[in-house]
Each structure stands twice: as C-alpha cells, then as structure tokens.
C-alpha cells in the first residue's frame, strides 16, 4: 500500500458517542460498520479512509452494534467470532476476494485481543493454538503473542496501519521498538478523546486516513497524524 501522499484525520461521533472504535473495523480494502449508521456517516468514513462506499459493509455481529470490538482484520482477511453464519455470508457477498475466518476461541471480543496490519499480527497471550492458526491462515501474516504497557487486551491499546502505529501512552521505548519490529512500521505512544489511554476505543485508521472521537484534542490529533501517517503532516 502507499507510503506517500496525504493523510487525513477527521473527528466523528456515532450514536452521540466519541468511542467510535468500538463500532468500526477498517483496513485498506474495506470497513465494517453497524447496520444502522446514517448515510452521512458512511460517506465520511468512505472519504476519510479512502474506501469505496460499497465496501463500507454494514452489519450486526452477534446481534450487536459493537463491530469494532467483535471483529478485526487486514486487507486480506476478516476475523469473526463463532456463531455468525449470516454475517459470514453477508461479508463474503459484499467483499469478494477477502478471506473470512471464524476464530475458535473463548473470547468473542476479537478486536480486543488481536491487532494487525498487512505485515503481521499481535495477539493477546493465551489464545488457543487453533485460534492463532486461523488468524494466521486468514490474514496471511505471522502471529506474535505479547502485551503492551501491562495491557493484555492488545487490540484495545494499539492502532496500527501499513504506515505507522499508535500505542498506549505507558508503552516503554523497548515496547515501541518491539511493536515496530513486529509490524515493520514506526510507532509512537499517545492518547485519544482528551487523555483516553486505550487508543483503539476512539480511533479507526488505515493507510489513507484516520477517524477520531469528537473529544480528541488538537495536540492528540497532531500526534496521530505523525504516528499513523508515517510522518506526514
């Protein structure tokens, strides 16, 4: 994917909530969103993240709007929890060519325990071997287990694209280097939504842009721009 060009960061609220990350999953080739978000929100998501509107797929997962919590993926594949037969068919029909994997694990909150870009995946320690194999096979990347800043729900504490990454503000220099080595992109530490440490809860990004919660401050946005845009300002 492109490592050059502009990188847009724009504020968004969904259902009056700045925690937009719990509702959305994004890669360079698609976005998953709740089935009842408005047309204006779909248009904003499409424009900022550079994804065609027909590839902003609206659905519920296990009957819930929390798409960003329950799913994750990269440009090659999407990971869904068990018990989602209808959703699997919907995604496969909408996103031809994208792999869909059902992860056999005790945790339905895949977005909290798995974080990935198109080069690698970091999973919370303790995920079952069969689950890790499904993740690797579906996404086409190596899976590494680890935690960041004492946080085992790594998917809530990290946002990474193919250009850069933003991690929990308590991540050490050694941890930031570890993340950079795993994902093959530079990493920064930061916050969203006026000091929230779990950056994924209010931040959704790909190589082309980022959407942040409405409470995110100017300095936080500047940090996100540099971290996820690969230094583009």
UniProtKB/Swiss-Prot annotation:
GO terms for molecular function: ribosome binding; translation initiation factor activity. The lineage of its organism: Archaea, Thermoproteota, Thermoprotei, Desulfurococcales, Desulfurococcaceae. CDD domains: IF6 (cd00527). This is Translation initiation factor 6. It comes from Aeropyrum pernix (strain ATCC 700893 / DSM 11879 / JCM 9820 / NBRC 100138 / K1). Binds to the 50S ribosomal subunit and prevents its association with the 30S ribosomal subunit to form the 70S initiation complex. The gene is eif6. It comes from the Archaea. Belongs to the eIF-6 family. Keywords: Initiation factor, Protein biosynthesis. PANTHER family: TRANSLATION INITIATION FACTOR 6 (PTHR10784). Pfam families: eIF-6. One of its GO terms (biological process) is cytosolic ribosome assembly.
